[in-house]
Every structure is written in structure tokens, then in C-alpha cells.
Amino acid sequence: MDNTPGALIAMSGGVDSTVAAYLMKQAGYRCMGATMRLYQNEDLGQSGFHTCCSAKDVEDAAEVAFQLDIPFEVVNYTEEFREKVIGKFIATYEAGGTPNPCIDCNRTMKFDKMLDFARGHGLDYVVTGHYARIEQDPETGRWLLKKALYTDKDQSYVLYVLTQDQLAHTKFPLGSMDKPSIRKIAEAQGFCNARKHDSQDICFVPDGDYVGFMERYTGKYYPDGDFLDVNGKVVGRHHGAVRYTCGQRKGLGLALGAPVYVCGKDMEHNTVTVGPESELFTTTLVAGDFNWISIPELTEPMRVKAKARYRQTEQPATVYPLDSGLVKVVFDEPQRAITRGQAVVLYDGDVVVGGGTIL
């Protein structure tokens, strides 16, 4: 019996997962590649299937797997993705929030379904091209999620959902590397995607028009409504409250003599409140659906650094436990446009303490 540890490489067709696969093969793991088929293009008003990326991406992943001489499969998770990622994406927008579907995909697809798939094939680990690090705390035995060594590429914010079991069975071989080094390896090995651009968009909304996607997907039409000022006075008409997010300035179509920003939405009455930028700042948020990583649970107030959006620098804050598994985060300084549906992630240095969804 072969006791060599086995690794399932989640291959997107991009250079990062390609080099991750190469590094795991070089390290002596029994490797298998897999690309997720997540939805049908009919969901986008197109024909055919779509994977987590594009048909070309699947071809690239398959070509790399062939070059590395590792087995490769495309796995079909369209039903699960429709329910757990697309469904939540639409529900969050319709409830007035702004979702982060990449986090939900990590939670329910890449590190849940793929780990099940790996175990079903006698493999020990799921491997991705994410920029983050995993270590075990020698004192507590807990598995820790840490920032990437090169923080300009760090993706720990979207990985806070990983459980202890998932962290124990996940490898991030790129966590201590920078992008130029990764491309250099890909070029040296002659991989077809060595110079391929990084993907930026939500995979199932490639044109960025998420409202158009929602209307095609649901068959709904999101009607026009009123813009209100902070005193409740009608100041204009909008094109559907789902189109706007907290802090937005561009695309409002309002000429009120001074810049205004989206400050709030009432989805029941289909109104969008706008006001001066000063209305966007607050020190406090409440979050739920929390996943703790470096600690088992929060039992007393804790000093942390917190970020409430992906591109934000962490800010000093205190986190307080509330009833029903909720937490309150109080920032030392007011923060701009804290947005329902987004994630708040807590850090202690380069270690992720935990994270949850802003309510």
C-alpha cells in the first residue's frame, strides 16, 4: 500500500494553481488535479457549461495536468453552487446587503465539497493557489491561518471561513512566495499559462453587470424608486435599490449642488437614502455567522486589528461577545461605509483570529 500523502489540486487554469500543482508534485505528493464545474451558462443567458473559470481555463488546467503527468477530472457542483453561492448572492442583494460570493464559494465549494472529493479518492489534502499560510500552534494545537508573507497578494480575508478540520487538510504552497517568482517557475517549466492575467471579476458575472445577471437568473425586474435625503425628502429617482451599495457616489444621476453618497437602503419601500460623506462614518458594527480560528470562541473583550472590506488596511479595534453567537466590533477610529453582507475579519499580527458577516 502506498503511504505517500496525496493532494487534490484545485486547478482554475491560472498560473497560481498551476505552480501550486507543480510544487506539490516536486515535494513528492501523490497529486490529482480537479476543476469545478459550477454552473451552466444558460444561467447567464448563454449556452453550454461554465466551470469555475472558462472553457479555455479548463483546457489550460487539463494541459498542465497532462504535462505534470497527474490525473485530472472536472467535477460537477452546479446544483450546490446554484443553491449555496448564487442563491445567497441574490438573497443578500435583495435584502439590501452587498455579498462576497468568493467567501461563500470557499466555504461551501473549494474547502468543503473538494475536501470530500479528495477523501473519496484517498487523498489527504486540498491544495489551492491562494496566497496565505497555514501553521499549527505548538502551544494550543489549533491550526492557524496566517497572512501571506508578501502582503500585497494576501488572501487571508476570503479564507476566514476555513474550519479546523479544513485547515488541517489544506495546503497553500504559494503562501511564502511573490508573484514574479511564481511566473518565473511557470515560464521555466513551459506552462501554457505562465503569462496569463489574473482573474478579477465574479466568475458568474464576467461582465460586472450583477443586476442584469440577477434579472436574467430570477426572471424578476427590479423597479425604479425614490432617492431620499437624510431627512426623508425625495430628491430624485433611482433604477432599483439593488443597484446601489453603501458609500457609492458614481452613477447616481443626481445634481444636488454637492457630492452625495449612498448612506442606506430600505428594500421594503424600494428607497435609497443619500447624504454627505460624513454620514458614512461609524465606529461600530455587529457581525454574525462567525468562524473562530486562533481561539475556540470569544468569551471576553479582545483587542484586535479588523478589516471590513477586502482592500482595506486592518484598523485597531476591540471585539466584544454578544448573545446568540454575535459579536460587536468597535473601531478606535470611525470607518467609512461599513456594508451589510460584507465580511469583517479580525487579526492578531499576521494571524487570523476569526471572521463573520456584517449585519
Predicted regions and their residues:
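AMP-forming adenylation/ATP pyrophosphatase catalytic core
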Residues: V127-I134, P138-E139, W143-L359
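ATP-dependent adenylation/nucleotidyltransferase module used to activate substrates
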Residues: M1-Y160, K171, P180, E187
